[in-house]
């Protein structure tokens, strides 16, 4: 398929939001994520990283942030949020909370970076947003994008939570079950994706 060349663009946006790669030109690997104002703007979804510690800072608006078993509303006054490796996390707009409803009419802007700062986050986001932009219509287009997205996630340390696991057996067992479920389901999707030509990253999207 013909892919849009986006590798040199400083910003990539789709209707729900997008990424600004140029806000911190003196700090490579730092990205600003925009979640547009609106009732139907999705969040990041629960996921975890295994080779990167992630740092998150709200620049504008209010974010409802989940880290492990704790969820709270954060604003720019709350400083830097640290997400340790293997810790499930997500964030979204906080419009439906008492603390966050004041920001319901403004875009949520969250700044992200990682340790190590190896540039992998930018490669991940560039490929993810570009795949969504290039998605073909119809069921085949949706399936193709899903397989491509899973392949990119697998190769760039982003693991979605398909099931949080049983809490009754304790956190250690819960984490093992969660990883097993994600690796099994995601691994099958990635294997099939690679068989049909999906790649970890695309030269049209990657600087």
Annotate the PLM regions.
Residues 1-37:
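A short, N-terminal "cap"/entry segment at the start of jelly-roll beta-barrel domains
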Residues 15-18, 46, 80-83:
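Extended, charge- and Ser/Thr-rich helical segments
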Residues 26-30, 40-55, 76:
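A short beta-loop-beta micro-motif enriched in histidine and acidic residues
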Residues 55, 62-64, 68-89:
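Short acidic-glycine-tyrosine-enriched beta hairpin
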Residues 85-87, 92-94, 113-115:
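Short, surface-exposed secondary-structure boundary micro-motifs
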Residues 96-179:
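Double-stranded beta-helix
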Residues 163-207:
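A hydrophobic membrane-anchoring alpha-helix module
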């Amino acid at each position: 398929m013909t892919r849009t060349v986006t590798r040199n663009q400083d910003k990539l946006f789709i209707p729900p939001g997008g990424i600004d790669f140029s806000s911190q030109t003196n700090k490579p690997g730092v990205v600003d994520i925009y979640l547009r104002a609106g009732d139907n703007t999705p969040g990041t979804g629960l996921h975890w990283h295994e080779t990167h510690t992630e740092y998150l800072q709200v620049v504008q608006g209010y974010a409802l942030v989940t880290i492990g078993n704790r969820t709270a509303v954060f604003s720019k006054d709350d400083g830097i949020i640290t997400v340790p490796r293997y810790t499930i996390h997500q964030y979204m707009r906080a419009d439906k909370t008492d603390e966050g409803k004041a920001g319901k009419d403004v875009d949520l802007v969250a700044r992200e970076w990682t340790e190590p700062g190896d540039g992998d986050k930018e490669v991940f986001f560039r490929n993810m947003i570009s795949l969504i932009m290039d998605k073909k219509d119809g069921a085949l287009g949706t399936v193709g994008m899903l397989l491509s997205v899973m392949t990119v996630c697998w190769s760039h340390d982003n693991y979605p939570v398909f099931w949080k696991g049983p809490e009754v057996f304790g956190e250690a067992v819960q984490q093992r079950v969660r990883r097993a479920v994600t690796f099994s389901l995601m691994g099958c999707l990635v294997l099939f994706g690679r068989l049909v030509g999906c790649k970890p990253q695309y030269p049209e999207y990657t600087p």
